[in-house]
Amino acid sequence: MNEKFARWNVLFIQYVKRDWKKIIVWVLGLGLFSGAFVPAFEEIAKGQGLLGMFETMQNPAMISMVGPTPIKIGTDYTLGAMYAQEMLLFCGLFAMIISALHVVSHTRKEEELGLTELVRSFRVGRQANSLAVISEMLLINLLLGLLIGGLMMSFGVKTIDAEGAFLFGGSIALAGIIGGVLALVMSQIMATSTGATGSTLSLIGLLYIVRAGTDVSNLDLSMFNPMGWIYLTYPFTKNNWLPLLFALIFSLVFTVLAFVLEEHRDMGAGYLPEREGRATAKKSLLSVPGLFFKINKGVMIGWLIAFVVMGAAYGSIYGDMQVFLGGNELMKQMFTQSGVSIEESFTATIMMVMIGLVTILPIAVVNKLFAEETRLHLSQLYVTKITRGQLYWTTIFLAIFAGVVGIGLASAGLGGTAISAMKNESTMDLTDFLAAGYN
């Protein structure tokens, strides 16, 4: 057992030295984003702000986006409760994604580049690299949690106490650890770093979508979702530490699973090998657009399906919004006076979120060009009449096309499901949703 992880501590120290700039940006950036907005929320809470926010956050649409609160009466809704409800889930989500990308880049990606083989040629254990990377990720998230807790306490707000502040920070830290552990498992299963990254992010997205449904329909089911353990701690209200225990056990189990999977596979291989290609290539590969579409086809199809599912998940909540509005006289008066329906208001909000996510696909397409060039896969093209400008502009047009199609599919998924959920009471049609997406 010791031989498998021999000299992991040496690798750990070297990795910290290598990544110290990245660690500083990671911890300070996410730490400030998570804990430094307390003064801004104090401004929101002035006057009747807390009561207004409480009524707004009872909307099933908002619960599906940011999570629930245990507070049942508006007068009990404190600044700490509002901050935890609006910030904790998204900060935890960011921590999961960043940790996952870090783990994949230092495990499966380095294995692809031959760096892992080089490291193993020295007197280190076969799995020392993975243990060192996980230990580094664990250290970073612990520092992040401590920074967030200390930062929130420093503002001296009465309803943000020490226990709640460090529970808030600990929840985000455990979220990051879960993301890193999931990435380590997927790095063993998938044959490439691209596959490991895509599957991990897809899994995180699936957990988010599932919790959006269970938070609205049956909150008890959210406790069985690893992402639910982030915000069901309820900092500054119930201060429930039990979900963090579940998260810790989950992380330990999946870490052991990842090491077992790594032990029984060959270096460079995966449990889900890549699909074999055609015996003969299509004629479309003779053109630059055809070649680049082929290179990006898998990523584009995966993300486009995710956009449809994401839109459909949020669209299913529209029926619950109408029920909520019918039983809340204050919210009904507010929307009547504003002249905007609750469906239109939510559509405008959720479209901004979905379009922000859709932008990931064009970025991934453009980044693919850089990755292919770095790996020298395009060297043979450069000796022909094809110019770098052709490759660049082809990629840009493909990225724009992917973004436009992504917005359309997300809007159609949202609109189609929303109209179905609202039945005959809908004030919007599919063209309204498409217009909101492209506006």
Task: Describe each region flagged by the PLM.
Residues 4-5, 41-77, 196, 202-257, ...:
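Terminal transmembrane helical anchor/hairpin motif
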Residues 21-65, 90-96, 199-211, 299-322, ...:
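Hydrophobic alpha-helical transmembrane segments of multi-pass membrane transport/permease proteins
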Residues 22, 26-30, 232-288, 295-311:
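Alpha-helical transmembrane segments of multi-pass membrane transporters/translocases
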Residues 83-108, 345-369:
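Long, hydrophobic alpha-helical segments
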Residues 100-122, 363-382:
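Transmembrane helix boundary and interhelical loop/hinge segments in multi-pass membrane proteins
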Residues 117, 122, 268-288, 329-333, ...:
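Juxtamembrane inter-helical linkers in multi-pass membrane proteins
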Residues 135-190, 194, 394-439:
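Secretory targeting signals
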